[in-house]
Amino acid sequence: MIFLASRDRYTQRTLLRDVHDRLRKQAGCEDVRYRPSHRRPRYVVADVDPPVFLGDSSDAETARLEIRFWYPVNVDHEYYRLNWVEPDRNFVLGFHRDADHQALGPCHIQLDHEDTATDRYSATFLDEHPLAVLDDRLQQLPTALESVRWTDGTPSLPTCPI
């Protein structure tokens, strides 16, 4: 069992259960599930109805959220990845707090698309409880998605929106 530091015996399993429950209540989120399984959860996935989730029209017909929180050894805080995935366009936009890309600071926003170069920018660091981070990032996601520019079917993130 993994306990998250400074989180009053908050386990990774408990955290993912709370993320799952939070997404089940989120407008536009459907078929919320654990991956790889309920017995061994590592992240939470939800299919998304983009216009309902974003509150306006969206070019995406389908999307999903992939959310992972974990607590690595020898680190005194949680890592996370909150990714918006549009499989039909091979597009991923996510907020990450992990050991990758240290030059960008503790958090970054990342855009991935097929074989194009990945866009990354430093993002606002949130030193909060993981569920507060989840809520804040979910609120920031529509603004981040609006900042993406599409040219001839290729997305770019010209500046950091958050």
Describe the function of each predicted region.
Residues 1-10, 18, 57-66, 95-102, ...:
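Acidic, Ser/Thr/Gly/Pro-rich low-complexity intrinsically disordered regions
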Residues 117-154:
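Well-ordered alpha/beta subsegment
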Residues 36-39, 87, 102, 115, ...:
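Solvent-exposed, non-transmembrane amphipathic alpha-helical segments
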Residues 1-68, 73-77, 158-161:
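Negatively charged, low-complexity tracts enriched in Asp/Glu with abundant Ser/Thr
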Residues 69-82, 133-139:
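Hydrophobic transmembrane alpha-helix bundles
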Residues 78-131:
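An exposed acidic His-Trp-rich patch
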